[in-house]
Amino acid sequence: MPNILPGPLRGFGVTFGTMFRRVTTEQYPDEKKPTMPRYHGRHVLNRHPDGLEKCIGCELCAWACPADAIYVEGADNTEEERYSPGERYGRVYQINYLRCIFCGYCIEACPTRALTMSNEYELADDNRADLIYTKEQLLAPLAPGMEPPPHPMRLGDTKDYYRGTPAAHMLSGEDDAASETTLDRSDDHSATYEEAERP
């Protein structure tokens, strides 16, 4: 008759040994581990300091997406109804989080840094339709001092917006020499997800 005791005894030995080790289980969602600064979470459509949208409706993010998770439909700005600097804006913007693999290719493809990724990772839902995020859900909330579009360009011409001329200088009307100053991306004053919680 084969000896069946060594196997179960070895199993109990492993169990007994782990009883005295430090617990590695995290009590989620009561205890949430902070994410790394460059974590790829939910997308955010950023704004310029006066509230205009950075998205120009070029669709490069949609073309770069390997999962075909992004749908963009651009439209023309008019002086009476302006949503972004320049000629066009993203009239329709959707991200399907049932498809998205959070690779970040869309972020790299964006020419105006309109699209960035936040640290939000709690996207689970019991309704598939609710995981197709619309432009209204993705837009960064208006920070203090911002005006909801549509409205005219408040910070100069299109070049001033895309060069990142400091908004404080443009609004205060200081000398033109200072207008040549540009901002590094790390000092971007645009509204991002971290400035206000999603409604």
Swiss-Prot record:
The record's EC number reads 7.1.1.-
Keyword check for Cell membrane: yes
The name under which this protein is listed is NADH-quinone oxidoreductase subunit I
List the cofactors: [4Fe-4S] cluster
Residues recorded as binding [4Fe-4S] cluster 2, renumbered to this chain, are C65, C100, C103, C106
Query: How does the entry describe its membrane topology?
Result: Peripheral membrane protein
Q: Which Gene3D superfamilies match?
A: 3.30.70.3270
Q: What's the source species for this entry?
A: Acidothermus cellulolyticus (strain ATCC 43068 / DSM 8971 / 11B)
* Keyword Amino-acid biosynthesis annotated: no
Please spell out the taxonomic lineage of the organism that makes this protein. Answer: Bacteria, Bacillati, Actinomycetota, Actinomycetes, Acidothermales
Q: What class of enzyme is it?
A: translocase
